[in-house]
Amino acid sequence: MDKFVKLTGVAAPLPVVNIDTDMIIPKDYLKTIKRTGLGTGLFAEARYNEDGSPNPDFVLNKPAYQNAKILVAGDNFGCGSSREHAPWALLDFGIRCVISTSFADIFYNNCFKNGILPIVVSQEDLDKLMDDASRGSNAVLTIDLEALEITGPDGGSIKFEVDAFKRHCLLNGLDDIGLTLEKGRSIDNFEKATAASRPWA
């Protein structure tokens, strides 16, 4: 998993509340267990017209936001059914950070496990960031995970909080497998000690 220390990129505004996982990645895209290629299905029902052509009115299809790295979204983002394909699709599209006033718990935790930083802010701060994100190609935010700070295009900053363990994992690029490998020496020592004390096992 790639480390997340500091991210600077265009932020796309998506002022819609209760965006569920089916909206993030429709069920038609859940047949694969590969993490790559799902970016094409991200927000598919909103991004594409019935004939499969891009919907020019959807924010991520607009030229200024096609390479967005940050999503500023409405309340209760990621609600609905549990599907890890949702953060996979966001990540495959290129989005490494989602900012909202609240997230569904399972989606929130899945983001950290897949290298995405979900940030919870107040409604007042979200309104400010949504306004910043509406500036098109000038909607550049910097997310500093070490400093726990968001810096807007006007230089103003907003502080945020993240669980210390989750922050450690993102800063060091540690997913569940990485965390296990980090304890490799301790595991080896335990197995050797067990083999010596219980040779019959």
From Swiss-Prot:
<dbReference type="InterPro" id="IPR004431">
    <property type="entry name" value="3-IsopropMal_deHydase_ssu"/>
</dbReference>
<keyword id="KW-0432">Leucine biosynthesis</keyword>
<keyword id="KW-0456">Lyase</keyword>
<dbReference type="InterPro" id="IPR050075">
    <property type="entry name" value="LeuD"/>
</dbReference>
<comment type="function">
    <text>Catalyzes the isomerization between 2-isopropylmalate and 3-isopropylmalate, via the formation of 2-isopropylmaleate.</text>
</comment>
<dbReference type="GO" id="GO:0009098">
    <property type="term" value="P:L-leucine biosynthetic process"/>
</dbReference>
<dbReference type="GO" id="GO:0009316">
    <property type="term" value="C:3-isopropylmalate dehydratase complex"/>
</dbReference>
<comment type="pathway">
    <text>Amino-acid biosynthesis; L-leucine biosynthesis; L-leucine from 3-methyl-2-oxobutanoate: step 2/4.</text>
</comment>
<dbReference type="Pfam" id="PF00694">
    <property type="entry name" value="Aconitase_C"/>
</dbReference>
<protein>
    <recommendedName>
        <fullName>3-isopropylmalate dehydratase small subunit</fullName>
        <ecNumber>4.2.1.33</ecNumber>
    </recommendedName>
</protein>
<keyword id="KW-0100">Branched-chain amino acid biosynthesis</keyword>
<dbReference type="GO" id="GO:0003861">
    <property type="term" value="F:3-isopropylmalate dehydratase activity"/>
</dbReference>
<comment type="similarity">
    <text>Belongs to the LeuD family. LeuD type 1 subfamily.</text>
</comment>
<dbReference type="InterPro" id="IPR015928">
    <property type="entry name" value="Aconitase/3IPM_dehydase_swvl"/>
</dbReference>
<keyword id="KW-0028">Amino-acid biosynthesis</keyword>
<comment type="subunit">
    <text>Heterodimer of LeuC and LeuD.</text>
</comment>
<dbReference type="InterPro" id="IPR033940">
    <property type="entry name" value="IPMI_Swivel"/>
</dbReference>
<dbReference type="InterPro" id="IPR000573">
    <property type="entry name" value="AconitaseA/IPMdHydase_ssu_swvl"/>
</dbReference>
